[in-house]
Amino acid sequence: MTPYDDSPAQAVSTAPRTTGPSLIDGFGRAVTYLRVSVTDRCDLRCVYCMAEHMTFLPKAEVLTLEELDRLASTFVGLGVRKLRLTGGEPLVRKGFIGLVARLSRHLSSGALDELTLTTNGSQLERYASDLARHGVRRINVSLDTLKPALFRALTRGGDVTRVIAGIDAAQAAGMTVKINAVALKHDNAGEIPALIQWAHGRGCDITLIETMPLGEVDQDRTDQFLSLQDVRRDLSSFWTLTDIPDSTGGPARYVHVAETGGRLGLITPLSNHFCDTCNRVRLTCTGTLHTCLGRDDASDLRAEIRRGASDAELVDAIHLAIGAKPKGHDFQIAAAQPAVARHMSTTGG
């Protein structure tokens, strides 16, 4: 097979092997979850994510598929058990399905528990069966509204019917779909109950996310901030919400909604941070390793690869970065300007 075609990958892990819980930060937290942005490009222009007339990175600055494979596989060799591919929009990256096929070897070998992705859903109808064939069992789909006009406005031109068709295709292919919705005070606040009912009616969990101060540095994020503590209080006035003791090391805290029978996740980086149990790091499409979404601390792994670093040297660079992972983020809703001046399309959503 050619390196990144769409053929089934051999069931052999080529990740550098270590023993024990390899990636432990300075606060004793094990890093077992890697999010990898495979591209900064996207076919939508969501208002809280990127500029309308976005200037994308030169291709030379973006990791090749081979480089993405090498870095992700190195992390798997160091004990990462969950790998999430993001963007931009990952499904617009040329050769993406081939990359998924290659990375699926770590599922076959048992080195990786889960290979998944976050998508805007616009290309999902086309690629759902391929993703399922290569071992993707769960996906997250970003969907902030079901209203066609509002969806077009928030995404600057998107078609919500394509996203819904993609969700249908993913479920038909056997994948579990979770909906991610950003809570926006002036746009979808009144639609949140209906969105939850719609998701649960389709057998999908849904997670609400507070706006985070990243992205366009000239934008005031306090205007759209909607506290999910307030949302939960309002929902509790007509639904029965029961906390679910589900500790995944992630930012979401889950409740069961008795009246719909579904799960609702709440990600509250501003009103109630999630740092103490953080088990994840992010690799951007340019090879920058961010050990905290809300801090500017970073390590340039692309430079290591392109200078010809050996596997052992690459492992050392990763250990050094993980050792410097901060205790918590710098997000504060009182600060009108973003705490971190970088686009989520590059960092990975």
UniProtKB/Swiss-Prot annotation:
Catalytic activity: GTP + AH2 + S-adenosyl-L-methionine = (8S)-3',8-cyclo-7,8-dihydroguanosine 5'-triphosphate + 5'-deoxyadenosine + L-methionine + A + H(+)
CDD domains: Radical_SAM, Twitch_MoaA
Residues that, per the record, bind [4Fe-4S] cluster 1: C42, C46, C49
Cofactor note: Binds 2 [4Fe-4S] clusters. Binds 1 [4Fe-4S] cluster coordinated with 3 cysteines and an exchangeable S-adenosyl-L-methionine and 1 [4Fe-4S] cluster coordinated with 3 cysteines and the GTP-derived substrate.
SUPFAM superfamilies listed in its UniProt record: Radical SAM enzymes (SSF102114)
Keyword Cytoplasm: no
Keyword Lyase: yes
Record: residues binding GTP: R35, R84, T118, K178, R280, V281, R282
Top-level taxonomic group: Bacteria
UniProt keywords, alphabetically: 4Fe-4S, GTP-binding, Iron, Iron-sulfur, Lyase, Metal-binding, Molybdenum cofactor biosynthesis, Nucleotide-binding, S-adenosyl-L-methionine
Residues annotated to bind S-adenosyl-L-methionine: Y48, G88, S142, M212
Cofactor: [4Fe-4S] cluster
Family as reported in the entry's similarity comment: Belongs to the radical SAM superfamily. MoaA family.
Function: Catalyzes the cyclization of GTP to (8S)-3',8-cyclo-7,8-dihydroguanosine 5'-triphosphate.
Subunit and interaction comment: Monomer and homodimer.
This protein's name: GTP 3',8-cyclase
Organism in which the protein naturally occurs: Caulobacter vibrioides (strain ATCC 19089 / CIP 103742 / CB 15) (Caulobacter crescentus)
